[in-house]
Amino acid sequence: MNKILLQCDNLCKRYQEGTVQTDVLHDISFSIGEGEMMAIVGSSGSGKSTLLHLLGGLDTPTSGDVIFSGQPMSKLSSAAKAELRNQKLGFIYQFHHLLPDFTALENVAMPLLIGKKKPAEIDARAREMLHAVGLEHRATHRPSELSGGERQRVAIARALVNNPRLVLADEPTGNLDARNADSIFELLGELNRLQGTAFLVVTHDLQLAKRMSRQLEMRDGRLTAELSLMGAE
């Protein structure tokens, strides 16, 4: 069994607006190992995106904790969480969130710039990742000049440019057609094999989820089961 990379212990999330209290997540506990590929499957509104925000340190749980590489996030300062996100975590979203005025190469390089790497290292690593996602020939193109599938590949290259230990992906193929969605998941699997990066993908698509090594189901803010999707149609 792979060494545990990230662990959730009884995560709960509650929002309060005036006298109205909304419980979004209920006692979420699970772990993901080094280099593992896991899917969390659930319909819209089931709490999947909220969970990813907690795992990435973008939001704070009402109770419970997230432990990354043996370190409780509750013990980290805001600056330490930001450094963790820059150095150890990658994020992929349904919408690519590329900067429109920057080229593909510049978008991929952004986490390295934030991390204050040396210029030569930034350029070499960003080009290496564009090559890894098959877009080195599009390095000087802006997002408006790329197809939807190409934009998402650039977003994936950006997420992986710092060689993170874990990538959190929120419906990464939600805006793509079936052919491009299939291509993106093939790419994630290849990058997992080549770099040993762990992936946690939330999705409502069973066909895509079954490509991952483990699948958990979320309903109404609760993890309800570990799924077996080998025969999913």
Curated annotation (Swiss-Prot):
Entry GO terms, CC: plasma membrane
Compartments where located: Cell inner membrane
Entry-linked CDD domains: ABC_MJ0796_LolCDE_FtsE (cd03255)
Membrane topology, from the record: Peripheral membrane protein
Biological process annotations from GO: lipoprotein localization to outer membrane; protein localization to outer membrane
Molecular function per GO: ATP binding; ATP hydrolysis activity; transmembrane transporter activity
InterPro entries named in the record: AAA+_ATPase, ABC_transporter-like_ATP-bd, ABC_transporter-like_CS, ABC_transpr_LolD-like, LolD_lipo_ATP-bd, MacB-like_ATP-bd, P-loop_NTPase
Ranges of residues in domain ABC transporter: 6-233
Pfam families for this protein: ABC_tran
Recorded superkingdom: Bacteria
Main location, first listed in the record: membrane
Enzyme class: translocase
Known role: Part of the ABC transporter complex LolCDE involved in the translocation of mature outer membrane-directed lipoproteins, from the inner membrane to the periplasmic chaperone, LolA. Responsible for the formation of the LolA-lipoprotein complex in an ATP-dependent manner.
Quaternary data: The complex is composed of two ATP-binding proteins (LolD) and two transmembrane proteins (LolC and LolE).
Name of the featured protein: Lipoprotein-releasing system ATP-binding protein LolD
Species this protein is from: Salmonella choleraesuis (strain SC-B67)
